[in-house]
Amino acid sequence: MRESLKNSKRLVIKVGTSTLMYGNGHINLRTIEKLAMVLSDLRNEGKEVILVSSGAIGVGCHKLQLPVRPTSIPDLQAVASVGQSELMHIYSKFFGEYGQVVGQVLLTRDVTDFPISRENVMNTLDSLLSRGIIPIVNENDTVAVEELEHVTKYGDNDLLSAIVAKLVQADLLIMLSDIDGFYGSNPTTDPDAVMFSEINQITPEIEALAGGRGSKFGTGGMLTKLSAASYCMESNQKMILTNGKNPTVIFNIMQGEQVGTLFASKKEELSHDRTH
């Protein structure tokens, strides 16, 4: 299964706030610069790359010198507005250093749920990729709401990245997080925690092993990553969860090395076997 990853042509890379930001709330420019280098090199190699990036609120908090993440929706959305602009400025600068053009794509759940607008998103992403542009996707946190009558929020970018991977029929979703993979117990408190190399089915037992929220500047936790993995597997797609502290790990993944946790259903493996 890992060996087949070498043939992946269309990739979705998801990077979380914990990878983009230091724990003290400052922007991790070194990691972002490395990420831009890796994705640019993949483009040079002939791969198609889509980046799903969190961080608008975290970067906004830094830009506005806020010590903690706001709690009210208007404040969060105002901070996201500032942060998204700053985040794209940083990405444009770093990707530009490697000769790449990036394009911003901000989505809300109603857009990808409604057939006509969903098709429009698919066409837009295809057009960007065909022009050699790297789409940078984020939820439109400035306008997204979560109400009973009108839900437009995805809840987190883990699910958004899985939805994008399905929309563009990506060969692989690589989720960069602050953990090396999916463990049987919490590796921060259990030194003997064992990491799963591959998971073929999200069982109640697997779900029970996940718990807790993400960083103070982000929203995701292991449960949201499992939900994204489940979405991918139901769509007959593959996802790898790994640590994003050194984005060059993506090169190792693309060489078929045993990095992180691979989520892939058995039926995906069977369909792959039939085509080879």
From Swiss-Prot:
InterPro entries documented for this protein: AceGlu_kinase-like_sf, Asp/Glu/Uridylate_kinase, G5K_ProB, Glu/AcGlu_kinase, Glu_5kinase, Glu_5kinase/COase_Synthase, Glutamate_5-kinase_CS
Pfam family, one: AA_kinase
Domain of life: Bacteria
Pathway(s) per entry: Amino-acid biosynthesis; L-proline biosynthesis; L-glutamate 5-semialdehyde from L-glutamate: step 1/2
Keyword Nucleotide-binding: yes
Coiled-coil zones: none
Binding residue positions for substrate: 54, 141, 157
Cell compartments where the protein resides: Cytoplasm
Reaction catalysed by this enzyme: L-glutamate + ATP = L-glutamyl 5-phosphate + ADP
UniProt-listed GO biological process terms: L-proline biosynthetic process
Enzyme class: transferase
One cellular component term from this protein's GO annotations in UniProt: cytosol
Residues given in the record as ATP binding sites: 14, 177-178, 219-225
GO molecular function, one term: ATP binding
Primary location group: cytoplasm
E.C. number(s) listed in UniProt: 2.7.2.11
Keywords for the protein's UniProt record, in alphabetical order: Amino-acid biosynthesis, ATP-binding, Cytoplasm, Kinase, Nucleotide-binding, Proline biosynthesis, Transferase
SUPFAM superfamilies membership: Carbamate kinase-like
Keyword ATP-binding: yes
Stated family: Belongs to the glutamate 5-kinase family.
Function: Catalyzes the transfer of a phosphate group to glutamate to form L-glutamate 5-phosphate.
Protein name: Glutamate 5-kinase
Gene this chain is encoded by: proB
